[in-house]
Each structure stands twice: as structure tokens, then as C-alpha cells.
A protein has these predicted regions:
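Membrane-interfacial helix termini and adjacent extracytoplasmic/periplasmic loops
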Residues: 21-29, 241, 264-288, 347-390, ...
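Transmembrane alpha-helices
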Residues: 337, 399-401, 407, 422-460
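Cytoplasmic-entry segments and transmembrane alpha-helices of multi-pass inner-membrane transporters
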Residues: 28, 32, 311-350, 399, ...
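Interhelical loop and adjacent transmembrane-helix boundary motif
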Residues: 458-512
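Transmembrane alpha-helix signature in integral membrane proteins
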Residues: 41, 290-316
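Membrane-topology segments of multi-pass transport proteins
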Residues: 1-34, 54-286
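Short cytosolic juxtamembrane segments of multi-pass membrane proteins
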Residues: 523-534
Length: 534
């Protein structure tokens, strides 16, 4: 074969080069345009996503401000000042119920009494608890009446708004006669709120009566059977004193309350960013506070990282530094195959297998020392965190192994030449040299799990509440809801353009910005790592 024949280009390649020359482009120019075009498209897509989220969520804060304005003008805020008292009293009765349960356990386990005898021994405490619980009844009845009045005012306002919208639509369609026939009953808040505000003297009298009842009930409290329970009961008495001492502040709020006071734009923003309630489709008042959703996402992600980081980084170190070639060929595909499992399949696995298995494991007596064990909620932070860890391991493993591969071979050889063992070389040379890359792998793993939807929707428990951190490490056995889960759960039920619809888009925007921040920090660490290695 001649040299010219051996180096001859394939016909198709030659034709392509000819076409490029006709376009005035070289092959290098075409490659640059192709890959540069892909990067440009990525930027465009990112910009479009950002614009879309801002456009759909932009009107939320204005709508939320109007939502808070109605809450004030209709008197709901006024009633909630009083309702806080009844809610705090309910919390105190729950404390009493816990005290009774502890005393019952003492009589059954320590005194070896029968259930009937134990209940008989608690008769005086039950009478005390009953009198404490019924002391709030007059105030609770008053709150019920005020709730009906405020709800009626709010309903009138909403109906008037619906009528205005109906008239606007008819006018836009050119049906002026029909639009003029739509009757709108405007709400005069000054007149509507007069009966509500007139109840202030009655409230003061009910408050004084409640204060006297609570003090009288405390004076007749039976002594607890053990010193430990006596300490807890003294704490209950202190809480009641604090509760009663707060009555004048409630009265002051009612006296100075003004329905005409404007709601600043900043309050609509802070109510979302720092709000502790996410309550929709409520007959009373809808609240859009992202804190419980953000905390839920953060808790599940932290549990996932606590589990995934040791496994992912440990596996990367073993495969890269210790494993034989045969072990590498077996381990790497197995770990990377995990990322191919659909998240919904993992969610079903969590519901049917993992959640139940962890709950049964928590009920083993030899594990009673573990915080939160035993527990009854099989769908919780721990279950979702374990499954998310499984999703994060391939990401952390792959990126951490790449970081270990980029450590110059001379580092290892110099360490061995100085007499260091393999373990010493790994711990003191290889891992520190690749630490920046490992940290970036962990951050990208965090970005992977914090944006996961199906697993947390199916396995986190979907309770919209801030976990009780007073439980310590046992907090991971509590159910939560997450930002991704709330979007997936509620988006199909909302009215396009409504406040609930826009609130979900603002949650999505927050999640999007959070993921961008995590990835930006991770990429910055990678760049610094590459510079230091270079």
C-alpha cells in the first residue's frame, strides 16, 4: 500500500471539510462553534428558567400583602390576640396530661397497683386537671362568637371582590348592561367591626375571672408522689404564672389595635421568609411561611450527608488507593448503577420496606439507648435521609475519586520513599492533597439531595411543622415536609395566578437559588483545587 493511499482521508470526512471551506470555516472553527453554541444554549436555558420563576412568582408579595391587609381589616387579627390565650392554655393542659401519664406509670410499675387502683389514686389529680381545663370555657366560647363575626366580615369582603371581578369581565366582553346589573355590596369596615370592638369590656371581665379561677385551682393542687414529679409540677406552676402574667399584654394589644393601620411591603416579605406556618385553604386565614419547609429540607439533607459522606468518600479512597483492578471493575459499576434507579422506585422501597424495617429495629430493647428509639412514625426524617443518602453516594463517590486521581503521583512516591506506610500516605498525604475536591464532591452531593422530590414526598412524612429540636438527636425520628415536596403535592390543586400558585413558585425560586449557590461554591472550590494542584 502506498503512503498516499494510507494517509488518504475517508470520503465522507473529505466532503465535510470541503463544505466547511465553502462556508469559510476551518475544522477547528466548527468545533469551537459547536461546543460554544452548546454553552450558549445552556446560558439561555438558565436565563429562561430564572425569568420564568421570577415572572410567575413576582406577584406573590403584593397578593400576600393584600392577604394580610384583609386579615387585619376584617378583625381576624383582633380575634387571634385572644385565641393565643386559649392555645397557650391548651398547651398547659397537654403538660398536665403528660404529668398524669408519668404518675400512672409510677403507680403501675413502682407501686405495682392494678389499673383500677392506680386510677383511683389519681382521682384527686384528675379533679384538679378537670377544673383547670374547664376554667378556659367562658373565654373559649367568647372566641367562638368572635370568630363567627370576623369570618362573616371576611366573607362579605371576598364576595364583593368576586362581584367586582365579574363586573370587570362582563365590561371587557362588551356586556355593559349585564355588568351594570351586577350588584356589589361594599363592606364598611368601621360599621362591621363595631360589634367586635364592643366586646372589649366583656373580655376584660372574662379575663379577670379566668385569672382568679387558675390561681384558685393551683392552690388546691394535690402533691405529686415522687420528688422528680414534684419538680415537673413546680415547673407547671411557673408556666401558669407566666401565662397569667401575659394577660395585660393581650389587653394592651386589643386596646391599641387599629384596623386602618397599613401593612408594609416588608411585612409581606418577612411573613414568607420567617413565617412558621404554611396553611392553605383555611376558612380562617391562609399563611405562607417557608421556614418549616426549609428546615424540613435541611434536616433531611443533613441526615443524608451524614450517611452518604463516609460511604461515598470511603469507597472512593478504597477503590482509588487500595482495591485491586478486579475489585475496581466490580465496585465502580455497582455504585454508579445506583444513580440509574428511578427515585420513585426508591420512594416505594422506603414506604414498603425501609420505613417499616427501621421502625421494627427501633423497637428492639437492645437499641433503647439510641435517641428517639423506639418510635412509631415509619415515614420521617431518618427514612427519607437514608434513601437520599443512597442517591448521593454515586455523586460523592465519582467526584471524590476524580479528586484523588488528580493528586500527583510524585506525592505518593515521595511518601513511600520516606518510609511511610500505605495508610499513613493515604491519611496524611493523599486525602489532604485532594481535600478541596472532596469538599466540592460533598457540596454537589448536597445539591443533588436538596433538589430531590419523589423520595421526600413519599417518605418524609409530610407534616408541615418545625421539628421539636428540644428532643435532641431524637428529632430525626419526626416527620417533616420539604420545599420540593410541597411544590409537587400542591401545584396540581392551585388556581393559576392565585396567591397559592405564586407562593409555590416563590418556593421554587428559593430552591433554585439555593441549588445555584451550592453549585457555585462547589465549582469555586474545584477551581481553587485545580489551581493549587497545577
Amino acid at each position: 500500500m502506498s503512503e498516499s493511499t494510507a494517509t488518504r482521508e475517508p470520503p465522507a470526512f473529505a466532503v465535510s471539510k470541503k463544505r466547511l471551506r465553502l462556508l469559510g470555516l476551518t475544522l477547528d472553527d466548527a468545533i469551537k462553534v459547536f461546543f460554544g453554541g452548546n454553552a450558549f444554549v445552556s446560558v439561555i436555558v438558565l436565563a429562561l428558567i430564572t425569568i420564568f420563576l421570577f415572572r410567575e412568582g413576582f406577584g406573590f408579595f403584593g397578593q400576600n400583602r393584600q392577604n394580610l391587609r384583609i386579615y387585619r381589616q376584617a378583625g381576624l387579627e383582633y380575634v387571634d390576640f385572644i385565641r393565643t390565650q386559649t392555645d397557650d392554655h391548651t398547651a398547659l393542659t397537654r403538660y398536665l396530661s403528660d404529668l398524669r401519664l408519668r404518675q400512672l406509670s409510677f403507680f403501675l410499675q413502682e407501686k405495682k397497683l392494678s389499673l383500677a387502683d392506680a386510677n383511683a389514686a389519681l382521682a384527686a389529680f384528675d379533679d384538679f386537671a378537670d377544673r383547670f381545663g374547664t376554667a378556659i370555657d367562658p373565654l373559649r366560647a367568647m372566641v367562638s362568637d368572635l370568630t363567627e363575626q370576623a369570618t362573616e366580615i371576611k366573607t362579605k369582603f371576598i364576595v364583593a371582590g368576586d362581584k367586582r371581578e365579574e363586573r370587570r369581565q362582563l365590561t371587557a366582553e362588551g356586556k355593559t348592561a349585564d355588568a351594570a346589573a351586577v350588584k356589589i355590596d361594599e363592606v364598611n369596615f368601621t360599621n362591621e367591626l363595631k360589634p367586635l370592638l364592643a366586646t372589649l369590656p366583656t373580655y376584660r371581665a372574662v379575663n379577670r375571672e379566668l385569672e382568679q379561677k387558675l390561681k384558685g385551682v393551683l392552690d388546691t393542687a394535690p402533691p405529686p408522689p415522687t420528688p422528680e414529679l414534684a419538680v415537673r409540677f413546680d415547673r407547671f406552676k411557673d408556666l401558669v404564672q407566666i401565662y397569667v402574667a401575659g394577660f395585660p399584654a393581650v389587653e394592651k394589644n386589643l386596646e391599641t389595635w387599629d384596623y386602618l393601620k397599613s401593612v408594609p411591603v416588608s411585612q409581606a416579605f418577612t411573613a414568607f421568609v420567617f413565617g412558621h406556618e404554611w396553611l392553605t385553604a383555611s376558612f380562617w386565614q391562609d399563611w405562607y411561611g417557608v421556614v418549616p419547609l426549609f428546615v424540613g429540607s435541611l434536616m433531611v439533607s443533613l441526615v443524608a450527608l451524614v450517611i452518604a459522606v463516609p460511604f461515598g468518600v470511603g469507597a472512593a479512597i478504597y477503590v482509588n488507593q487500595i482495591a485491586t483492578a478486579a475489585e475496581q471493575k466490580f465496585i465502580k459499576p455497582c455504585i454508579e448503577f445506583i444513580s440509574a434507579i428511578p427515585s420513585v422506585v426508591l420512594g416505594f422501597f422506603g414506604i414498603a420496606v425501609l420505613g417499616q424495617a427501621l421502625r421494627l429495629l427501633s423497637q428492639q430493647s437492645w437499641l433503647s439507648w439510641v435517641p428517639g428509639f423506639p418510635y412509631s412514625e415509619r415515614l420521617n426524617i431518618l427514612t427519607a435521609g437514608c434513601l437520599l443518602a443512597l442517591l448521593a453516594v454515586p455523586t460523592i463517590f465519582t467526584l471524590a475519586e476524580d479528586a484523588l486521581n488528580n493528586v500527583p503521583r510524585a506525592f505518593k512516591e515521595a511518601s513511600f520513599a520516606l518510609g511511610a506506610s500505605r495508610l499513613q500516605t493515604i491519611v496524611k498525604i493523599i486525602v489532604p492533597a485532594s481535600l478541596s475536591g472532596i469538599v466540592s464532591a460533598v457540596l454537589l452531593g448536597l445539591g443533588r439531595v436538596i433538589g430531590e422530590t419523589m423520595v421526600v414526598l413519599l417518605c418524609a412524612g409530610n407534616r408541615i411543622a418545625i421539628p421539636d429540636f428540644s428532643a435532641g438527636l431524637a428529632v430525626i425520628t419526626q416527620p417533616v415536609h420539604t420545599m420540593t415536596g410541597i411544590i409537587a403535592q400542591e401545584m396540581g390543586e392551585v388556581v393559576r395566578g392565585g396567591i397559592h400558585y405564586r407562593a409555590l413558585f416563590v418556593v421554587g425560586l428559593l430552591l433554585f437559588l439555593l441549588s445555584l449557590l451550592i453549585n457555585y461554591v462547589a465549582q469555586g472550590i474545584v477551581r481553587r483545587y485545580r489551581i493549587s494542584i497545577g
